[in-house]
Amino acid sequence: MSVDSMLCDRIDIAKQLIKRSEALSRSRVGGVEGGAKLCSKLKAELKFLQKVEAGKVAIKESHLRSTNLTHLQAVIESAESLEEVVSVLHVFSYNDQFGEKQSLVVDVVANGGHTWVKAIGRKAEALHNIWLGRGQYGDKSVIEQAEDYLLASSQQLVQYSSPHIIFAFYNSVSKPMAEKLKEIGISVRGDIVAVNTSQENLPEENYLSGSESDCDGDDTAVLHVSKVDTENIVASIAFPTEIKVEACKRVNLDITTLITYVSALSHGGCHWLFKEKVLTEQAAQERQEKVLPLLKSFMEAKELFACESAIKDFQSILETLGGPAEKERAALLVKSITVVPDQPSERASKLACSSKINSRSISIFGTGETLKAITMTANSGFVRAAANQGVKFSVFIHQPRALTESKESSATPLPNNYASSNLL
């Protein structure tokens, strides 16, 4: 292929990848984190190639082959192959074995955060040579990179488990490297190719000194040379269609969840116009999407916990604002919960209080972390504020529902023909 035709091909690929990256960003409600960064990198590549095409930049054919497009294409193809992609080109911080702060770019974070993918576009032969120490000075082998991934993932738990790591090879990987990756706990995706070992005779003075050589009196030493055979594919591994995640079986209930679970709004009492605007808004949200089935589905077959502070404050709120049916449902719910003392985790206790962070929330969410439970909550403000201080909790966030049974006497029933456009 001539340089001109290769250039045209690269420009076409860049344009297609930009479209695919934009579609990827739209594939998730709220967007895919890092999608804009990915798109920006692709547009920069396209701009550079168009400058080359216009004669503004001189470039060698070898440089044209080694643009970032290969890697960016691998990132997009990986993201398109997986479910629940939450981010691309995400930077994670971690401490290395010496305690030094390091950062790691994970190409694709999928499966709701449970899967990390490194997309690799380099050729198998180059990767194999670097691993054997034949690369350029400073080149880091894939195995060394895998060790970084393992260390970083052990410090970035998702629901108290380390993310599963996949290395996706788009230009093959040698069998010995694939086996080594699997040995240390990395899943491999892509074509696995054979390595042929040949023997070359070298003059002994070019290889080993006489005292070091196993050759007895020979003038030559045998050098075993391995070479990747890209034509000999010994296995081809696709992305798993379904990655099984060991689900956390413990749930910690926040006050907002306790209230939502027993609220009259969640039990059919959403066909009212309340005097309080916030209650009317919540009633409209409930008519649009029922919250109780979501809560029950998540809580099913799990152990339910709540700390003493949460139960005490819930019962206090219930006594003041709850209606008879809401109190009855609350009594049944509390019976199914294991109530534990407040025992906030060390990192939760270090959170600085603010308008969104108070001592009660620290106790509730921190106790959930100590229990290694997922905290169910409608308090997304606290979750965001804590994350801004570097503390990310394992949470299930849902819409809030207030106690409304006692408010129904002063509310206006919705007429049967009430239009959805007049919900509020």
UniProtKB/Swiss-Prot annotation:
InterPro entries: DUF1308, DUF5614. Transmembrane segments: none annotated. It comes from the Eukaryota. Belongs to the UPF0415 family. This is UPF0415 protein C7orf25 homolog. It comes from Xenopus laevis (African clawed frog).
